Amino acid sequence: MRIGVIAIQGNVEEHVEAMKRALGGKGEVVTIKHSGIVPTCDAIVIPGGESTTLCRLAWREGIAQEIIEKARQGMPIWGTCAGLILLASRGDEEVTKTKQQLFGLMDITVNRNAFGRQIDSFEAPLAIAGFDEPFNAVFIRAPAIVSAGQNVKVLAKYDDFIVAARQQNLLVSAFHPELTDDLRFHWYFLEMVPGWKN
């Protein structure tokens, strides 16, 4: 199993390390900084970061186009925080103002700074669909999903905002599972991979 982590900007190292732990030696994790690597992977993680910069670089490097193509073929893609924004079909005024070209893969509308700025970062226990125990979620300038289509399964909510969801092979979380020692969200994503092999 080969998991690619988009490494053009953002919270990359933590994701790589957490994914390696989650794989337990039964696969490899590669970082992606340019086009040509996405098609060689079995699944992709789009980490947090500054969404405007991440979006611009992904399109410029040809990575966005590759992700869209592979996602439409069924490759599992997981977007955390800024990655959630990129996978969305619709954004709020903030997204429109910055002229972000979203990937348009998930039938969701996103509020880019739903939980405020960096100083408003916080942790909260979340009830996540399919998890026996609450998941301690770390939110950093987090976005949120304000509406979702019928094909989108809501996995978690916080303050009436959707903060984790899945649409077939696409998974998003507004929080950062890689910043905790809890690997359940990583395992959840990895369970999506065997059904689709590159």
Curated annotation (Swiss-Prot):
Pfam families per record: SNO (PF01174)
The keyword Ribonucleoprotein belongs to this UniProt entry's keyword annotation: no
GO biological process: glutamine catabolic process; pyridoxal phosphate biosynthetic process; pyridoxine metabolic process
Pathway of action: Cofactor biosynthesis; pyridoxal 5'-phosphate biosynthesis
Keyword terms of this UniProt record: Glutamine amidotransferase, Hydrolase, Lyase, Pyridoxal phosphate
Family from the record: Belongs to the glutaminase PdxT/SNO family.
Chain's role: Catalyzes the hydrolysis of glutamine to glutamate and ammonia as part of the biosynthesis of pyridoxal 5'-phosphate. The resulting ammonia molecule is channeled to the active site of PdxS.
Subunit structure as annotated in this protein's UniProt entry: In the presence of PdxS, forms a dodecamer of heterodimers. Only shows activity in the heterodimer.
Protein name: Pyridoxal 5'-phosphate synthase subunit PdxT
Organism: Methanocella arvoryzae (strain DSM 22066 / NBRC 105507 / MRE50)
